[in-house]
Every structure is written in C-alpha cells, then in structure tokens.
Amino acid sequence: MERADSAADEEQVFVTLTVADQLCGVPVLGVRDILGEQAITRIPLAPPEIAGSLNLRGRIVTAIDLRRRLQLPAAPSGEKRMSVVAEQGGELYALLVDQVSEVMSLKSSAFEQNPPTLTKTWAAFSTGVYRLDGRLLVVLDVGKLLNMADAG
C-alpha cells in the first residue's frame, strides 16, 4: 500500500515558460541551457518555424520559434525573447519562448490528460496539463516539437 502512495506522490520537475501568454512546462532533464536574447541568423529556404541559427559557445544551434511551431501569432516586433536549449539526436536546438519563469516540482498525481478544449495543434505537442492557481500549465513534448516531419 505504501508503495502505491509513494508512486502517486512522485514529483516531476519542469522548467516553466510562457508562449503567447500560455504557461507551459518542459521536463527539466531535457533542458541543456537557458539563454537570454540572442543574435539569430536567418536560414534561407528554411520552414517558417525555423527562426534561424545561433552560436552557443562556438556550436551552431537551430532556433525554433515556438509561436510559429504552435501556430500562434508572431511575437510583437522588438519584443525580447528567451531560448530554452534542448538536445535531440545529438543536436542542440533552441526553443524561442516569450519568457522563462522558474523550475517547478509538481506531484505526478496532479497530472491530467489534455482537456478536450485544447486545440488540435497544442494537443499534438503536449503530453498533458497541470491546473495551477487558476492557470493551466501545458506540458510540452520536446521530442515532438523538434520533429520537423510533423511541421505545419
């Protein structure tokens, strides 16, 4: 009996971020770095969700605009954005977000499946949600976000 209770009380740790006023979380173990505003070089003929590339300590990193990836309106011109760096298949990717907030531990027992009201695009890139003080934290699946075969 105790074992089942302790499993329900396990905590998941997330880096919380905001994309177009939506609170999101990505598992902290998948995050390599958090970056402030970076110079991004546009890549000709790249899909629209590829913002370009940036230099991270001498390593070229593909920058993915999460607003475009999630089919949201573009960020206001001149708005400073942050990057959450994740690794997939040995390559580094920077997910451009509006803001990175905090690292948060949440009980696994509070995790819920995606609600039916979540748009098709959001549901395709999320694993579920947490309800926090009247806000919905959408847990993003970084692997799916980085799979460009699912683009558009």
Where does each model-flagged region fall?
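An acidic, low-aromatic, low-complexity terminal/linker signal
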Residues: 1-152
